[in-house]
Amino acid sequence: MSPLQPLVLALLVLACCSAVPRRRQPTVVVFPGEPRTNLTNRQLAEEYLYRYGYTPGAELSEDGQSLQRALLRFQRRLSLPETGELDSTTLNAMRAPRCGVPDVGRFQTFEGELKWHHHNITYWIQNYSEDLPRAVIDDAFARAFALWSAVTPLTFTRVYGPEADIVIQFGVREHGDGYPFDGKNGLLAHAFPPGKGIQGDAHFDDEELWSLGKGVVIPTYFGNAKGAACHFPFTFEGRSYSACTTDGRSDDMLWCSTTADYDADRQFGFCPSERLYTQDGNADGKPCVFPFTFQGRTYSACTSDGRSDGYRWCATTANYDQDKLYGFCPTRVDATVTGGNAAGELCVFPFTFLGKEYSACTREGRNDGHLWCATTSNFDKDKKWGFCPDQGYSLFLVAAHEFGHALGLDHTSVPEALMYPMYRFTEEHPLHRDDVQGIQHLYGPRPEPEPRPPTTTTTTTTEPQPTAPPTVCVTGPPTARPSEGPTTGPTGPPAAGPTGPPTAGPSAAPTESPDPAEDVCNVDIFDAIAEIRNRLHFFKAGKYWRLSEGGGRRVQGPFLVKSKWPALPRKLDSAFEDPLTKKIFFFSGRQVWVYTGASLLGPRRLDKLGLGPEVAQVTGALPRPEGKVLLFSGQSFWRFDVKTQKVDPQSVTPVDQMFPGVPISTHDIFQYQEKAYFCQDHFYWRVSSQNEVNQVDYVGYVTFDLLKCPED
């Protein structure tokens, strides 16, 4: 990718070179924040041919013969007209969205035939894209595996840990495997051939819009469509809509048709919207109230003011300052832009561009045909923009292709086959005879007469959501989601929207069963100690104890870690809870897990946080104000940003420089009641801060002083 261009609006003026009048050329705009490339067609071809294995180097000789040979090889491989020239057909093929696996050669080179030598293949969905509901992603992957199990003896079982044969991951740009993605469009995904470690894994570019190939997938609530997804585009009163709308309503409730023609079918539902419900917070899912007052100011829309993590929230009464009731606003997938310089923001309609007003996404100003919108009311003034949601790429089809690689298949030269390198949307059965012959060459045909779906295990998960209020913690998050709302509605967009929230929420956490026979005072050295929900937790070998609230017994437990956090390993190195978002980070070896309630992100490698291979483990964490955390390893610490989930690489600091007097080597570092604790063996050094100076104010025993164990 070329460097970002200066934020300058430049119009390309085409000079008239003839007295004959010409049709006015479209205005082409250099959009601020958009990566641009000045590659010539030859440079594009050389880069492409090298990347996908057709040439040994990125630059070819000037005589043109080596380029011609490479082009012929490329054209022959992909069943294109064999001209040996950089013609329009060849250039269009090079610009088409495709798989990132090389056509010639492999990511990893091994001798012999690469295939799995067992038939029950396991897979793990390590993380999720926010483009689709998790249940839709789970289903897309299960259906993709089912294509291959229907024609082979293979079965596919979902597991929940890195021991899986195939680890599925969404990532952006450089995502830890040495084969970076390239942003929106272009390279969609890649996978590695069978084997240990990263071999067999499948990675998907999360800068793409993932859908089922026919636009964003938006579930509906209430209405009369029984939760069916929106159908885009749809027709209402003779007009076509490609996003949820408030037209036809007087209450500003967003709705959509769930068929192509609302006028004919009258099937509709309400779209996720802050006027329908809020998420988490402390208002039991009640909808936003607009306008509302916060710190004396009036707000007529969701805002991130008062927060350092960028989450959009609203008050659920007219006065937050008085009532302190709030919730987080649902994401508008149908109107959230990607790319540009305002990714994640909402389109604002109408907006002004070059003096003209636009009430929908437009292609004006672009020569690539992509729809875009401004995210403020005036692009000419603010220069804030992004790409509008398009049809997206079918996660099911791309996954089925990548899983073919994960099973040992190469690209084919048959354009109609699933394993052809270029993306092609189809609603027909995607497996071609060529695909079936290839996979059965490796594993043989399915012995059963009737194909069956793969063996899978599914769980219901929820999107991670922050739970802290705009400024200070008012109350904890609700223990249960709001009760079910109405399930039926009028046949047309009603005059008033339902008052209830979505009809489903996360399931309750497993009941903990303490075993009093196991005494915390018998534990020698704990694996990790952390303050979670304002209570000190002690972790050891898959179990944990916690200090009780108020009076009564001082220590509760032990509890099984997996009863509360099922994905965690038996051995933990450290943990911390971010006081702002209530996210809980758990570290073990070179991996980190992030829990928000029952929702999980990870495990992720420490590389994702910006911690290099020299960091073998994170031995402690000290939360700091405004979403910052100090992460410790060995004799150093780094400053970590919870919002970006990245460390500042320039922040590495010796521990004794900021915390003089603590041991050189510590195994548990945690914060409790606003003081830092550094543990070594059975002892801890407590550090307090006065006038921005840290000093040890107490040295004590973990068992006797923190746990109040008897000294005899």
Curated annotation (Swiss-Prot):
UniProt cofactor(s): Zn(2+); Ca(2+)
GO cellular component: extracellular matrix; extracellular space
Binding site for Ca(2+) 2: 165, 197, 199, 201
Enzyme active site: 402
Catalytic activity: Cleavage of gelatin types I and V and collagen types IV and V
Glycosylation sites: 38, 120, 127
Short sequence motif named Cysteine switch, residue ranges: 97-104
Species of provenance: Bos taurus
Biased amino acid composition, Pro residues: 491-504
Signal peptide: 1-19
Protein name stated in the entry: Matrix metalloproteinase-9
An annotated Gene Ontology molecular function: identical protein binding
SMART domains: FN2, HX, ZnMc
Proregion span(s): 20-106
Note on how the cofactor is bound: Binds 2 Zn(2+) ions per subunit. Binds 3 Ca(2+) ions per subunit.
Binding site for Zn(2+) 1: 175, 177, 190, 203
Hemopexin repeats: 523-568, 569-613, 615-662, 663-709
Function as written in the Swiss-Prot or TrEMBL entry: Matrix metalloproteinase that plays an essential role in local proteolysis of the extracellular matrix and in leukocyte migration. Could play a role in bone osteoclastic resorption. Cleaves KiSS1 at a Gly-|-Leu bond. Cleaves NINJ1 to generate the Secreted ninjurin-1 form. Cleaves type IV and type V collagen into large C-terminal three quarter fragments and shorter N-terminal one quarter fragments. Degrades fibronectin but not laminin or Pz-peptide.
PTM per Swiss-Prot/TrEMBL: N- and O-glycosylated.
Domain-level remarks: The conserved cysteine present in the cysteine-switch motif binds the catalytic zinc ion, thus inhibiting the enzyme. The dissociation of the cysteine from the zinc ion upon the activation-peptide release activates the enzyme.
Family statement drawn from the similarity comment of this UniProt entry: Belongs to the peptidase M10A family.
